[in-house]
Amino acid sequence: MTARFQKVASVFAAGMLLAGAALAASGDAALTAVTGVTVIPMDAERTLPNQTVLIAEGRIVAMGETGTVTLPAGAERIDGAGRYLMPGLADMHAHVYGYDLAEQETQDLSEVQAQLIGYAATGVTLLRDAAGTPGHFLYRERVAAGDWIGPDLFLASPIFEGERNVWDFTVKVTDPVAVEPLVAGYAEAGYWGLKIYHTVSPDVFDAIMTSAQAHNLPVMGHVPFDVGIDATLESGITSIEHLRGYDFDGVPVASLWADGGRSRERFSSWNRMTPERRDELVSKTVAAGVWNVPTLAVNRMLFDPAARAAVIEHPRFARLLPAMQEGMKSMEGLDAIFSVDSRDALGEAYPVMLEFIKALSDAGAGLMTGTDSGVPGYVPGFTVIDEIQTFGDAGLTPFQALQASTIAPARYLGIADDRGTVAVGKRAGLVLLDSNPLEDLSALWDLSGVFLNGHWHSLADLEAAMDEQSTMAAE
């Protein structure tokens, strides 16, 4: 899958670069230029001051010191003086509301549009949905066509679960023979990869990994309870979500299954992990080339009222759909999933999890930002910035934390030739900020606007779109 993505991205980028050069030469007015801006290219820890960046047909077609780049007459100009242009952010674990294709005929999709706008309004230009449905392909098409405002979507399959499934919307598989037809169907449908849950049995897990390899589909997900972290790291899985699975040591199987797999005893195991075991797990993770999407910012929402209050008090929160606001304020859905004991245990384990992230980073393991947003109570977009700041809290430098939301996801997806840095030929999924996030990660909140596939959306435009969706929902 990775090799195929890289080949397609390389050929497409080359073709679009030539097309962009032709547009610039002809003076076509369908060009946008950001002038006098400081570029944070994210190819190295550096800034490029006083740059002009020229965008056409969704690509960066020219970039250089202001005054050296010829701007065609009629090109739209955006004043970048005193501002910073960087790659757009990525949410590598999200849940956009999904429906079956047949259901979409009767569903109001304004809530979906509101979600996607919410991501864009916090600088998210790429999103990996961790539980795809057939309906998500329609959303992806509408975003790609420019009909909807939102990030580019990479869709994982519907979630594979086992006998003791947690969710009723997942695909329950107990017979390994049933796996291959499902995987073949997901590959044919165009899903990016497969998603597994901790309830999958060892024989079904093995069948999933075998079929995934045969169809060139990456596998992401939770570590199955009956497989364990060591075997999972050796299986070919590409990313582990929420750090789930590193916390199995010394926990009886019955305790792992308690509270839907979210027991106090399980989360408390973080505080019993020895430095030697931590180093062993980190080394195995690096050796296997497995990435992690920790989603720690959302864990903090569960045990830290201040974290939840910070989101609710943010000026942009009032622009969300009323249902989203109420979900965040009440956290009713999550209260039914995480017991008070398990939330307390998460709070006690949180500092150790931060240390684990730092150990992974120091060892060179792949880290990416994700939010689990779309789950009741988690607000689209907001938590991406919180997660980046959480990486900073773990001891990563601002540049390292930003990498986890820009070039790192592009490398993981095999599209680093196409995205993840600011350079000529790259896709123009970009964020324009009023201050420098390399100095302070909170600068990510100082959004001036975002380029989605080369289309400019100012913050005012994005907020107006959010207001429109909220008004429609209230009618």
What is the role of each PLM region?
Residues 36, 83, 93-97, 222, ...:
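Histidine-centered divalent metal-coordination motifs
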Residues 22-27:
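Boundary at the C-terminal end of the N-terminal hydrophobic targeting segment
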Residues 115-134, 151-158, 185-199, 218-220, ...:
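Divalent metal-dependent hydrolysis catalytic cores, especially in the metallo-beta-lactamase
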Residues 9-21:
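Bacterial N-terminal signal peptides
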Residues 39-52, 65-68, 379, 397-402, ...:
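Acidic, glycine-enriched loop/beta-strand segments at the rims
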Residues 84-145, 163-166, 171, 177, ...:
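Metal-associated gating/positioning segment near the N- to mid-region
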Residues 182-195, 200, 249-394, 467-470:
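Active-site neighborhoods of metal-dependent hydrolases
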Residues 28, 39, 44-86:
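Histidine-rich, glycine-flanked metal-binding segment
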